[in-house]
Amino acid sequence: MILSRILEHKKAELRHKQSRGYLSELKARIQDTPGPLGFAVTLEATRTAGCPALIAEVKKASPSLGLLRPEFSERFDYLEIAKTYHTHGASALSVLTDKDFFQGSLDYLREIKQSVPMPALNKEFMVEEIQFYEARAYGADAVLLIVAALERQQMIDFYALAKGLGLDVLVETHHERELDRVLERLPDVRLIGINNRDLKTFTTDLGVTIRLASRIPAGKLIVSESGIHQRAHVVQLAEAGVHAMLVGESLIRADDIGEKIRELRGVSAQATA
């Protein structure tokens, strides 16, 4: 299973970072880093009845597809992509920082946050405490916790650590058992992600969000992830009570990113001019 491979590799990758010196360096950098923007608050403020808030993803590659665009082998202009998202009405950003499987970088996150005035999610496989300090030091406003990747107590501890650092937390689920675990163990969680991608087959099904959304109590922000490619999908999610959607692949691979955002949001070019 691809997730198991990624997690095993991630733990090995992080071993050399487990030093007091590096942690001290990150804590010092945090002191000089502006406080996080409100990721959840922004999603709540920018969603509408007919359109969930858009979390637009800066993504170079994936394990299943490789590079999302051929020209990325020569140049990946992550700053220009993030600025385009901002210009055309995205509510927030998601920035892939995993190096070996998604060809991301923490430096992408840092530079984007220095140039684009939007809240950003550090899209990473969080398996060690040091990663939360990295996320905060590099400018993240929110982090991702993947329930399938964590033990129960680890999920609780990581959530508390992130909140203690001032970060919002998107807790990602894939099925009913994971959702029930989150609602039981993290009763004050605000952001619940539902990933429509099957981690074994990598196929997507929006029915996963529709099924799980009905089980989530009021007061939570529901974020649908993966498999969102057209306006009809967005309408379907809005009708299911989804508050935000995380979209990467269909934006990155579009001939015109701005036009694709307008299509998904159901707005005219004049409305974003």
Question: What name fits each language-model region?
Answer:
Residues 233:
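Acidic, divalent-metal-coordinating active-site segment for phosphoryl/phosphodiester hydrolysis
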Residues 150-159, 178:
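A short, conserved beta-to-alpha structural element at the edge of catalytic cores
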Residues 1-109, 114-120, 127-130, 161-190, ...:
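Conserved N-terminal beta1-alpha1 strand-loop-helix module at the mouth
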Residues 226-228, 238, 247:
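C-terminal active-site rim and adjoining tail of enzyme catalytic domains
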Residues 134-154, 193-201, 242-261:
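Glycine-rich phosphate-binding active-site loops on the catalytic face of alpha/beta enzymes
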Residues 123-124, 139:
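Alpha-helical hinge/cap motifs
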Residues 89, 139, 216, 241:
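Conserved functional loop/turn residues at catalytic and ligand-binding sites
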